[in-house]
Amino acid sequence: MSKTAASSAVDASQAGTVKVGDMVVNRMGFGAMRVTGDGIWDEPKDKEACIATLKRLPELNINFIDTADSYGPEVSENLLREALYPYKGLIIATKGGLVRTGPNEWHPCGAPKFLRQEVLMSMRRLGVKQIDLWQLHRIDPKVPRKDQFSEIAAMKKEGLIRHVGLSEVTVDDIKEAEQYFPVVSVQNLFNLVNRKNEKVLEYCEQKGIAFIPWYPLASGALAKPGTILDAVSKDLDRSTSQIALSWVLQRSPVMLPIPGTSKVDHLEENVKAAGIQLSSEVFAKLDEEGKSEDAKRQEEEKKKSS
């Protein structure tokens, strides 16, 4: 039985690697949503801190960075270029397909001409001739899927996009998209206490698709005193969010978490999770408690909707 332990090193490469198409990246990435203003809108309050955080990424061996044209909008992509261009040794993934109308307001738009504009503008802001990984942020229910997927396939064929990913999708969504292009990544909600995307994760494992969980640090009520999460946290002198993140990493070899922040100290705290090794016994206990919390969440959602 493996022993639960924590390394003192702050190095994303401790998490191992995962393939995203033909690209191999360290399995601890970074989500650049938080280097913006409140409500993921406008410029950040402390731009210098955000730039310093972004510049720290390659020093910690983080080589997969996820952003979106809607973060700001445009702000996140612009800051990435300012801090890290020409991205030596880095894979920059971005997303498109959402319209912003204000803070915390997001609306799907899958019109083919709009998607093409999104790709071209992201290329311009990032200063690249090809986007490493472009992800459809949301499938637009008001636009025929054939139109959305065909346009994405065309842009890939033209060389504007190297690889294609999807976000917030079902297994059936992935299978439908795969009729038009290879899907190399899926970005869905997943964490210790929210398992609604287990079937999607299983499909990704079968197909060798990188699974990018958003909101990977969540631990809900398990962060309270007396839980196994609390006990492991105290034993290793690590935060409950670090333990929750280490559980996500160990849940599957295709997992590629991208915790984000606008501060260097928080970034380093997150990366330390890459050096935590949970024993099989501790992992199983966390898994069991997490499933229990997820069941409670689902029950509460049913009550609210009834």
UniProtKB/Swiss-Prot annotation:
Ranges for region Disordered: 287-306
Annotated InterPro entries: AKR, Aldo-Keto_reductase, NADP_OxRdtase_dom, NADP_OxRdtase_dom_sf
Predominant localisation class: cytoplasm
Localization: Cytoplasm; Nucleus
Keywords: Cytoplasm, Nucleus, Oxidoreductase
UniProt cross-references to Pfam families, sorted A to Z: Aldo_ket_red
Gene Ontology molecular function, alphabetical: aldo-keto reductase (NADPH) activity
Top EC group: oxidoreductase
Domain of life: Eukaryota
GO cellular component: cytoplasm; cytosol; nucleus
Matches recorded under PANTHER family: AFLATOXIN B1 ALDEHYDE REDUCTASE, ALDO-KETO REDUCTASE YAKC [NADP(+)]
Family to which the UniProt record says this protein belongs: Belongs to the aldo/keto reductase family.
Record-given protein name: Uncharacterized oxidoreductase C215.11c
UniProt source species: Schizosaccharomyces pombe (strain 972 / ATCC 24843) (Fission yeast)
Lineage: Eukaryota, Fungi, Dikarya, Ascomycota, Taphrinomycotina
